[in-house]
């Protein structure tokens, strides 16, 4: 790979172009090494472009920026309303990028090594009770093709614990109704097989036979859940559909998130005695600690039930 040599001169428009080239070289490198998703690469690119533009205003460049400068940059992001989670992601991006510059001998040091991680509040995922999930899944009017599609999508989400991006990205070749499993391509293009369950299989069969043909309008694309125009549905569109059905189901908007059924899937499995590592595998988490947050949700629910029903609660 051809490397762009860093200049010690004050950043100019030409050096701004060099910055962009180096960013793309870095993204190519981590994509090849780790197989990151397009969404992750896009987030890295936006973070580094923001830093590059800030460096121009400070008359700095990749070679001259120091740890104190990076602290100042992070502070400006927080002042602009960055949430702690976004700041933590930005810090991760900076560390990876400057480690890359150091490894490739484009810098003699790593100014990100001494950066501190913002303290993140421990948030429990928003979850729904089993009755609330039942109300949500019952909200679509299955007489209409679009609502039959939505019914199938909601059932699959809850049955399989998918991310919304995984759901809208499903192809017909990913579904085996005979075997009762889905092939899911998750983060980092990692593949996993997830069982569907009887309800999801039934509603998928109904939708594929009666709903999908009307939405596809003769198109031969492999998309499982098309939009009204027969094209791939966006995550934002499905999020609007979830909010629509939540209103019908009488669910408080504070309880909602795009992954509300994924969270319910994990919590309800644990409530019914599922092993944590099995839930980790079904969710497609690479790290068990990511899954362990759901044990706190299950514990909190048990505390509430104890207080409500135990004579000394």
Curated annotation (Swiss-Prot):
One of its GO terms (molecular function) is DNA binding. GO terms for cellular component: cytoplasm. Keywords: Cell cycle, Cell division, Chromosome partition, Cytoplasm, DNA integration, DNA recombination, DNA-binding. It is found in: Cytoplasm. One of its GO terms (biological process) is DNA transposition. Pfam families: Phage_int_SAM_1, Phage_integrase. InterPro entries: CB, DNA_brk_join_enz, Integrase-like_cat_sf, Integrase_catalytic, Integrase_recombinase_N, Integrase_SAM-like_N, Recomb_XerD, Tyrosine_recombinase_XerC/XerD. FtsK may regulate the catalytic switch between XerC and XerD in the heterotetrameric complex during the two steps of the recombination process. Residues 17-102 form the Core-binding (CB) domain. Site-specific tyrosine recombinase, which acts by catalyzing the cutting and rejoining of the recombining DNA molecules. Binds cooperatively to specific DNA consensus sequences that are separated from XerC binding sites by a short central region, forming the heterotetrameric XerC-XerD complex that recombines DNA substrates. The complex is essential to convert dimers of the bacterial chromosome into monomers to permit their segregation at cell division. It also contributes to the segregational stability of plasmids. In the complex XerD specifically exchanges the bottom DNA strands. Belongs to the 'phage' integrase family. XerD subfamily. Forms a cyclic heterotetrameric complex composed of two molecules of XerC and two molecules of XerD, in which XerC interacts with XerD via its C-terminal region, XerD interacts with XerC via its C-terminal region and so on. This is Tyrosine recombinase XerD. It comes from Proteus mirabilis. The lineage of its organism: Bacteria, Pseudomonadati, Pseudomonadota, Gammaproteobacteria, Enterobacterales.
